């Protein structure tokens, strides 16, 4: 080889080596821009609407960082795979949301560093695994009620939660005061310590969005310990050992050498409370090591709760008596009877307080035949003791009877069947029998222990179980069966129906229910003052007694009308339905004009529950329809039609009120009617004299008459007029009497002879115009004999009272003692301190001052 060729070969070899070296350098530079590691936290996640994990990625920092959940495990990014992107950084932490649609399983979380994330992007060296597990809402761990200075209930879950609802109740009332949440620990503060059984109802959501809803029992721990202070707990109660942090280890051991009790536990996740149950534990001092450092202890003692039942074999006529005692006095103990299933027997609960010696007696009400135990519970500690079995047998002499051997009622009414019970509180009543086409068996229970049950039987709807009821809400009834051939909706026929009462499965006594034919007896018209409040039966009868509701055939327009219907057999219909539903099907009340005038149809008033108040007094077979003439309208049609032209009731209209029980209904075979007529007059007041001449003495009468309803309150004013001096004003409140008159006595003893005045009478409520008259004061007539004086006093007592009556319903004859208001006379006077001369001097001085200023 020539020298030139050798040199050329060396140069070519050097060039090849340099090319390889340069390529290696270039390749190394490209590899630096890549994700090198990825870490997923947490590495397990529950499926849920808000599940997510954090992914920390180390990279070159030159490009954006991308992570994705490799659903198909192909090492590449697919467009449908969950992903997240962050800006370029050497270390980036990204939040990756896991959709609820992702199936449970193990997946790779892949990472890559590139300018963008597109389909086909390759997983680089960085990836980690993630377990997606099936949706699992937060689990309830515990709920403990204790008092560390603040009464509270700690509720612990197995993971962090958000509280949507958290209520602590005693079964009825929400006792929660406030709620605080720390991860999976929820503290509910209460206003006090509750010894009753508590429940917690919650609705919480975990971090994955899964919701848990439930109601759980609360454990009551009356003793709270957190240090080595002298803490005492009675055997059988719970002790709350409270740590300074959640999920803290707790070691328990007996202090005595002969007590080898040891236990290792913890407060549990998201709880600071370790509950130590002393039930069955040796009486000893127990020491707690909390978190390896915190020390606490409690002395477990015997409460010595004892329960004694006086007699373990009694009858249904006897109460359960006994006594309870303990080693500590002034304690509250709850006593209750338990049936053979261990359930509390209703109405047997009682609470006793132990005296200073720790003793108390109890007496529970009688119970049905069966086997029972008595449970005593110390209210504060929850220590419970149960008695031996108490056997209760049915008293042999228990009987049922009827208060009356014959019960009379009308078809359609409600029969009151009074059942008396002796030696038992239950009995079965049979009404009728198969031969009568109707038979019903109803069991009654005397829950108020008065020895009787009043069974109500609605003969208007005998086929329905709702046709039975009891008069006292404390008593109970059960319809066992009804056997009948009566078509639906029809009443029982008139006749005699056998009654039978049985206790213990055997018939004790019998009686007879006599259903008589019903009748439509009468209609009467009454009137009351404008605005009278008549809504209940008592209101009507009180108004009649006080003469504020009077029977009439003439009433003033604007006053209240009361139509009284007397008819038997309607009580059951009114109990089962209402006036509007019954009108047109069972009966009609028509108030029709009798004087419409020539070429005009009669007015028919629209009487219904909207325009009238219906008051049913079924016990007395009386029904009141109350309406105000100002509130009802009328149509000139055969029956009231609110779609036709409507008219008002006018003065001088006359009406006939007719109540008809319809033959097409269930209460009568033929139409039965009763009616009453009344006239509407102008509301007027009239004074008895055009000019009243009174004496200058007391007890001078002012009187008049009125067409408005008796009981209407009037105001009478006596006002001085003309040149009368001094001026005066006298007023009195009076009420229209049953005969349409009114009067009041006034005192004119301070007035002068020939003083003149004006009298005005006006209604306090209504449309009647005022009545006026003149008056003059004359010389008083002297009383010459004692007899005359006595007569005057009696007359005064019947016409006046010392004070006005605030409520007109108290008495229709009450009047108010007139009140006199003196009117001051008008007199002339000069301005104090100034005369004419002084005023002139002041004017001159002012003028001079003005001139001086001008100069």
Swiss-Prot record:
Major place of residence: secreted
GO cellular-component term (any): plasma membrane
Biased composition regions of type Low complexity, renumbered to the chain: 782-802
Pfam families with a match to the protein in the record: DUF7827, GEVED, PGF-CTERM
Positions of short motif PGF sorting signal: 832-834
Disulfide links within the chain: none
PTM notes: Glycosylated. Cleaved by the archaeosortase ArtA at the C-terminus, with removal of a short hydrophobic segment.
Main function: S-layer protein. The S-layer is a paracrystalline mono-layered assembly of proteins which coats the surface of the cell.
Protein name as catalogued: Cell surface glycoprotein
Organism: Haloferax gibbonsii
